[in-house]
Swiss-Prot record, chain A:
NCBIfam families: PRK05715.1-2, PRK05715.1-3, PRK05715.1-5. InterPro entries: NADH_UbQ_OxRdtase_chain4L/K, NUOK/Mnh_C1-like. This is NADH-quinone oxidoreductase subunit K 2. The gene is nuoK2. Its main location: membrane. One of its GO terms (molecular function) is quinone binding. It is found in: Cell inner membrane. It comes from Rhizobium meliloti (strain 1021) (Ensifer meliloti). It is a multi-pass membrane protein.
Length: 100, 166
């Protein structure tokens, strides 16, 4: 059996890498992909703890996280297409029109 | 054997995640993310959740990555390829990340709760049946709400990406 802390350390590593992608990259597409990575690292933790405590709720929460992620990606990519059509940029720093 | 496979999958997933963040071309990032999701679904199998592994492959590798690649195909990424990876002024964010990561690792390794290996769960072959019974009885309302959220996101994505009339 795999010890629980291995899974947690894998989750931590993927979370830190994904957060680095969100904070350090300026390309909107890569920021969105890093968000996917963050949600997946959370899923690893859910499933590892669900197995550890022999409980279904970890897997059920992971299913809901996957469903909400699909919705989020669809809306985010719709916003991205509308943004590129109007402003023709992919950099996060160029999209500051809502800043007062 | 089990642990060796886990280490292999974990290493490959971390390497592909680093490739995702460090690659300059968004297409390379998308392919690295796809490889990373495959490794994570293998890890789900090892953690005793084969249904989640299948869902992971269907939803992430099958649907979300195709969506990403379609959008990459629609927008012009040539300008994005040319930009530098790390513009200046991000040192506070990097320091914060390193601090956060070390804190999480230290807290996990500090407590002896997680060190002992898990109790061997002897469950019959009907784990998926039990899972779906729990999902559709105790968690029916969140399930329906999730389906409504998906429908709303579908309509919202169509409305957002549509050309403005006139």
């Amino acid at each position: 059996m795999v010890p629980l802390w291995w899974s947690i350390l894998l989750g931590v590593a993927l979370f830190v890498i994904g957060a680095g992608g969100v904070l350090l990259r300026r390309n909107i597409l890569i920021v969105l992909m890093s968000l996917e990575l963050l949600l997946n690292s959370v899923n690893i933790n859910f499933i590892a703890f669900g197995q550890y405590y022999d409980d279904f709720r970890g897997q059920i929460f992971a299913i809901f996280v996957i469903a909400i992620t699909a919705a989020e990606v669809a809306v985010a990519l719709g916003i991205l297409v509308a943004l590129v059509r109007n402003k023709s940029t992919l950099k996060v720093d160029d999209v500051t029109i809502m800043k007062g | 054997m089990h642990q060796g496979f886990f280490l292999l999958f974990a290493t490959v997933s971390v390497v592909t995640a680093l490739t995702l963040v460090l690659a300059r071309n968004p297409v390379h990032s998308a392919l690295a993310l796809m490889a990373c999701f495959l490794q994570i679904s293998a890890i789900f199998v090892m953690l005793g959740a084969p249904l989640l592994a299948v869902i992971q492959i269907f939803v992430y590798v099958g649907a979300i990555m195709v969506l990403f690649l379609f959008v990459i195909m629609m927008v012009d990424v040539r300008e994005a390829v040319l930009q530098r990876f790390m513009p200046g002024g991000n040192l506070p964010a990097l320091a914060l990340l390193l601090l956060l990561g070390t804190e999480m690792v230290v807290l996990v390794l500090w407590s002896d709760r997680f060190i002992e290996s898990p109790p061997v769960a002897e469950r019959g072959g009907d784990a998926i049946r039990d899972l779906s019974k729990t999902l559709f009885s105790d968690y029916l309302l969140p399930f329906e709400i999730a389906s409504v959220i998906l429908l709303a996101a579908l309509v919202g994505a169509i409305v957002l990406a549509r050309k403005e009339p006139g």
